[in-house]
Amino acid sequence: MAGHSKFKNIMYRKGAQDKKRSALFSKLSREVTVAAKSGLPDPNANPRLRAAVSAARSGGMPKDNIERAIAKAIGGDGDNYEELRYEGFGPSGVSLIIETLTDNRNRTATNVRTALSKNGGNLGTSGSVTHGFDRMGLITYKAEAGDPDKIFEAALEAGAEDVTSSEDEHEIWTAQADLHEVAGKLEAILGEPEGVKLAWRPQTLINVDEESAGTLLRLIETLEDDDDVQTVWANYDIDDEVMERLGQE
């Protein structure tokens, strides 16, 4: 998603990531527990759990925390979380898909609706946004994993469908059904990835001007700050110069 990784870097430079470390661990822990409950509590036998554990490690979550999250699932402890997806629109008509894990759907719906309405957006109906996205597998590696040519060749050999590389990371896209097979092949070549997940890839992007971009990024940040929100997908494109200026504010 164009602009998204740069937005993450801007937030990092502002020091926001350090302040949100515990919140991040909470989200990662929740996903590990839900993934463990969805199948066997063994990452080697449960692809979703393996991906969740990989994401937790990449997020800097201590091994003990990860093991406790799995133990909650084995022991039947912890809340029962429901996976809910919301669709909406932001400034400039940008489409948003908001994936959540919640133990209180009324609270989550209210928070999502409020975040949208206060930042130039509105909640849509089911299917109002997803038709403009493709459901695909997404494997991410840091830029240091290799130059774009090396990553492209490895991804092609592993059966991926597309690769996009930036100064920060490599995004490797696969067919939905091939995600974990491709991830396994790539891990043997490139090492453990930063992330392995099912994703929503926009079919087209909307270019957002500077005024709307600031509001849009605040909206995404507000949504991602919510404890129940796991991931926000969007179809925006923001020029690099605009992103740099926003990062200096």
UniProtKB/Swiss-Prot annotation:
Domain of life: Bacteria
Database matches in Pfam families: TACO1_YebC_N (PF20772), Transcrip_reg (PF01709)
GO MF annotation list: DNA binding
Disulfides per UniProt: none
Keywords: Cytoplasm, DNA-binding, Transcription, Transcription regulation
A biological process term (GO) from this entry: regulation of DNA-templated transcription
Subcellular location: Cytoplasm
GO terms for cellular component: cytosol
InterPro entries recorded: Integrase-like_N, TACO1_YebC-like_2nd/3rd_dom, TACO1_YebC_N, Transcrip_reg_TACO1-like, Transcrip_reg_TACO1-like_dom3, YebC-like
SUPFAM superfamilies in the record: YebC-like
PANTHER family given in the database record: TRANSCRIPTIONAL REGULATORY PROTEIN YEBC-RELATED, TRANSLATIONAL ACTIVATOR OF CYTOCHROME C OXIDASE 1
Membership in a protein family: Belongs to the TACO1 family.
Family annotation (NCBIfam families): PRK00110.1, PRK12378.1, YebC/PmpR family DNA-binding transcriptional regulator
Protein name: Probable transcriptional regulatory protein ZMO0153
Species the sequence originates in: Zymomonas mobilis subsp. mobilis (strain ATCC 31821 / ZM4 / CP4)
